[in-house]
């Protein structure tokens, strides 16, 4: 269910939504065994834990203050409810099989936001900035901290628009790090971090043979 309106240079849209997932997969940490000193050996993997109900509100704003500057943003607030149990087994130091079950019934609220800016600089250089933030969220095993990230991109058409030179900087301040606090009574109490990829800077050159950038693909 959504609503769209335009006020001068501003375009606003709002919507509410509901999603139901019968087989919901989540990242789960569990004890796979014990080392000779009795310290738990933990494993992280995606597991089908049961069902998920998600409801939320989304707000989108597009704004062009000038011909050379375009802004678009998105804000999403949601509430998620999970239901299910996770069964697993491991051997203790005496080689006894230990059966465990963890309940994943949980309700949490969170949000995420995105802002994208596109500026046309002199000499027909395009400058794009993308900023995202995923808010913190609790789960049945602990919580995930908020994640902030920013990307930059500069591009220019050359050779009579037959080619494009682009400079991209992904994760400018090296902040796209997933921080987890995990607590399972009697088994796990830990803080961990996971970074998919550190800051990257790439320079690319794309040439379009027998085709201008403004040409349309043949139907």
What are these regions (language model features)?
Residues 7, 11-70, 74, 100-103, ...:
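Outer membrane beta-barrel strand-and-loop segments of large Gram-negative receptors
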Residues 107-158, 173, 181-182:
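C-terminal beta-barrel architecture of Gram-negative outer-membrane proteins
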Residues 3, 14-20, 73-79, 129-133, ...:
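Transmembrane beta-barrel strands of outer-membrane/channel proteins
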Residues 16, 24-33, 38-40, 83-92, ...:
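Outer-membrane beta-barrel translocator domains and adjoining extracellular loop/strand segments
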Residues 6-8, 51-55, 103-111, 146-150, ...:
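Residues that define the transmembrane beta-barrel architecture of outer-membrane proteins
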Residues 156-219:
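C-terminal beta-signal and adjacent terminal beta-strands/loops
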Residues 9-12, 67-71, 123-128, 160-165, ...:
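Repeated loop/turn-to-beta-strand initiation elements of outer-membrane beta-barrel proteins
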Residues 1-5, 57-63, 115-119, 152-156, ...:
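Residues on the lipid-exposed face of transmembrane beta-strands in outer-membrane beta-barrel proteins
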């Amino acid at each position: 269910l959504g609503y769209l309106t335009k006020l001068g240079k501003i375009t606003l849209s709002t919507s509410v939504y509901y999603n139901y997932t019968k087989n919901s997969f989540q990242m789960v940490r569990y004890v796979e065994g014990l080392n000779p000193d009795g310290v738990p050996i933990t494993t992280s993997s995606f597991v089908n834990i049961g069902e998920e109900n998600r409801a939320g509100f989304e707000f989108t704003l597009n704004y062009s203050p000038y011909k050379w500057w375009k802004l678009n943003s998105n804000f999403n607030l949601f509430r998620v409810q999970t239901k299910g149990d996770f069964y697993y087994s491991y051997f203790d130091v005496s080689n006894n099989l230990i059966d465990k079950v963890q309940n994943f019934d949980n309700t949490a609220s969170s949000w995420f936001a995105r802002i994208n800016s596109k500026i046309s600089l002199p000499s027909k250089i395009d400058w794009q900035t993308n900023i995202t933030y995923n808010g913190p969220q609790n789960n049945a095993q602990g919580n995930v901290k908020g994640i902030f990230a920013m990307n930059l991109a500069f591009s220019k058409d050359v050779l009579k628009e037959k080619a494009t030179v682009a400079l991209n900087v992904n994760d400018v301040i090296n902040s796209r790090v997933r921080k987890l606090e995990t607590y399972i009574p009697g088994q796990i109490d830990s803080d961990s971090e996971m970074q998919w990829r550190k800051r990257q800077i790439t320079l690319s050159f794309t040439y379009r043979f027998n085709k201008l950038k403004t040409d349309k693909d043949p139907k």
